[in-house]
């Protein structure tokens, strides 16, 4: 995770593994000294990853990796934010915001993204993750994009967000924030019905 060899390439595995490992330690480790060491090592690894990312926040692996790279950075930071009762927060950091906004800035329409690296050209954007991340960093661009991803052109309505089942932490986060995005989508549906 970047700690063994200085200057090594870091990729989406760094935040992905760190978010899963830190969650397990916080939930299961009873020895405070061991927990403190795990948190310190994990934060050091994530610091290396965040310093590896360019200032524009782009994921060099392509937009298809956004959920595993920037998305897992969000998960990691939200876990530490919640575990510290808000004392630990990087959500005001510009690079963190730009990493989140990369998903909307790489989108070119009709489900397509600017394709590079080994990423696919079509992307099923995880609207609930984009909403949660955007809400945390205060990005109207991201929350608007999350709602855009819920739009159903055939019906002219906004769908309810989906609770993903393949990532337990994200599923629980979606349940926690679901009322906010659902109310925004319902509000847009009411507005469309009156217009």
Q: Which residues fall in each region the model found?
A:
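Carbohydrate-active enzyme catalytic cores, enriched for enzymes
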Residues: 68-195
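Aromatic-lined, polymer-binding surfaces characteristic
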Residues: 1-113, 119-120
């Amino acid at each position: 995770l970047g700690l063994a060899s200085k200057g090594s390439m870091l990729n989406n595995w760094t935040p992905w593994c760190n978010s899963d490992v830190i969650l397990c330690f916080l939930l299961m480790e009873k020895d405070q000294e061991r927990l403190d060491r795990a948190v310190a090592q994990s934060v050091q690894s994530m610091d290396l990853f965040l310093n590896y990312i360019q200032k524009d926040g782009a994921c060099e692996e392509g937009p298809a990796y956004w959920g595993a790279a920037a998305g897992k950075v969000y998960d990691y930071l939200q876990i530490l934010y919640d575990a510290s009762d808000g004392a630990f927060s990087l959500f005001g950091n510009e690079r963190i915001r730009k990493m989140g906004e990369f998903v909307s800035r790489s989108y070119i329409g009709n489900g397509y993204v600017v394709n590079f690296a080994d990423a696919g050209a079509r992307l099923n954007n995880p609207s609930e993750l984009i909403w949660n991340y955007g809400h945390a960093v205060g990005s109207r661009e991201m929350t608007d994009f999350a709602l855009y991803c819920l739009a159903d052109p055939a019906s002219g309505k906004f769908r309810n967000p989906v609770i993903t089942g393949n990532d337990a932490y994200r599923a629980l986060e979606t349940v926690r924030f679901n009322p906010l995005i659902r109310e925004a989508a319902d509000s847009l549906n009411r507005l469309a019905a009156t217009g």
